C-alpha cells in the first residue's frame, strides 16, 4: 500500500487526489441524469457543471478549515502544510458546512430553490465520500484502533485504559492477546496509522465507512430518489443516514478529537440526526 499510483521525479499521482477528481466527474454525471432534479427545473448542463465545481471547491475549503481547527496544535507549528490538501486532512462535517454555504449563494444567484439543489447533491456527495475513503486508506489515515482488543472494550470507550495495561506487559505476554481478533490491517510506519500503532493490525475504519457510504448511496439513488418526496426530504434522509454511519464508524476510529470525554463526531453526528428528523417533520407539514 502506498499513497500514490506512480511517481515521476518530484511528481506523484496521489490516490487521494485522484479519488476527488473521480468524485467530481461522477457528481456531474449523476446530476445530469437526476430525473427528479430535471422535473424540478434543473435542466441546464452547463449550470450543473458550474454548480458541481463551485460546491466541491467550497466543500474542500470548508473541510480543510474544519480539520485545521481541530488539529491546530499541530498546524500552528506547521503553517506551510495547511494548503497541502493532497496529503490528506479533510473533515467531512466541515465539507458539508462549506457545501451548504456554496449552495445558498448559488441558489440566490441563479434563482433556484435551495432544497432542490441540496436534494440533487446528496447522492453524488455520499458517493464522493465513499471514493474519498479509498484515498484515506492509501494514505494510511482515518485508521481504527488495534484489533487485538475485545469488541466490548472498543465500543465501551475503555480502550485507552486497556491499551496502557497491555503496554505494561512483557512482549511474551502481549503476544498472547494478538490472536483474540481474527483480522486487521497493518499500515506502513510512514503513515499516521503506522506511526501511532506500528506493527499492529488495526480496524480499517476508513473501509468500514467506504462500504456503509456506498450502501447509503444505493439507497438514496435507487430507492429514496424515486419516491419523489417533498423538497428537502432527501437532504434530511442524508443527514440521518450519514449521522448514523459516522457514529458507528467512530466507535472504531483512533483519531477522533475528544471534547469533555466525548468524541467530537458523536456530538456533530447526533446533531445531524436530530436536524434530519426535525426537518422531515417540518417539511411534511408544509405545502409545496
Regions inferred by a protein language model and the residue ranges of each:
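A feature for loop-to-transmembrane-helix boundaries and adjacent hydrophobic helices
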Residues: 1-288
Amino acid at each position: 500500500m502506498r499513497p500514490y499510483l506512480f511517481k515521476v521525479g518530484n511528481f506523484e499521482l496521489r490516490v487521494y487526489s485522484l479519488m476527488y477528481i473521480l468524485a467530481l466527474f461522477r457528481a456531474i454525471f449523476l446530476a445530469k441524469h437526476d430525473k427528479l432534479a430535471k422535473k424540478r427545473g434543473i435542466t441546464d448542463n452547463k449550470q450543473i457543471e458550474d454548480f458541481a465545481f463551485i460546491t466541491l471547491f467550497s466543500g474542500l475549503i470548508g473541510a480543510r478549515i474544519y480539520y485545521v481547527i481541530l488539529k491546530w496544535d499541530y498546524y500552528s507549528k506547521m503553517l506551510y502544510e495547511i494548503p497541502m490538501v493532497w496529503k490528506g486532512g479533510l473533515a467531512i462535517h466541515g465539507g458539508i458546512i462549506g457545501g451548504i454555504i456554496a449552495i445558498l449563494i448559488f441558489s440566490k444567484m441563479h434563482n433556484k430553490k435551495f432544497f432542490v439543489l441540496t436534494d440533487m447533491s446528496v447522492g453524488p456527495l455520499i458517493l464522493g465520500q465513499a471514493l474519498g475513503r479509498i484515498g484515506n486508506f492509501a494514505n494510511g489515515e482515518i485508521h481504527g484502533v488495534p484489533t487485538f482488543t475485545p469488541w466490548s472494550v472498543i465500543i465501551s470507550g475503555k480502550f485507552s485504559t486497556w491499551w496502557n495495561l497491555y503496554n505494561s506487559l512483557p512482549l511474551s505476554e502481549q503476544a498472547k492477546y494478538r490472536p483474540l481478533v481474527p483480522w486487521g490491517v497493518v499500515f506502513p510506519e510512514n503513515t499516521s496509522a503506522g506511526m501511532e500503532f506500528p506493527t499492529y493490525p488495526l480496524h480499517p475504519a476508513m473501509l468500514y465507512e467506504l462500504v456503509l457510504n456506498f450502501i447509503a448511496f444505493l439507497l438514496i439513488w435507487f430507492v429514496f430518489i424515486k419516491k419523489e418526496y417533498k423538497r428537502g426530504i432527501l437532504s434530511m434522509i442524508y443527514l440521518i443516514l450519514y449521522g448514523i454511519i459516522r457514529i458507528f464508524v467512530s466507535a472504531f476510529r483512533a483519531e477522533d478529537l475528544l471534547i469533555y470525554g466525548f468524541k467530537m463526531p458523536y456530538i456533530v453526528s447526533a446533531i445531524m440526526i436530530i436536524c434530519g428528523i426535525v426537518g422531515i417533520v417540518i417539511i411534511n407539514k408544509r405545502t409545496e
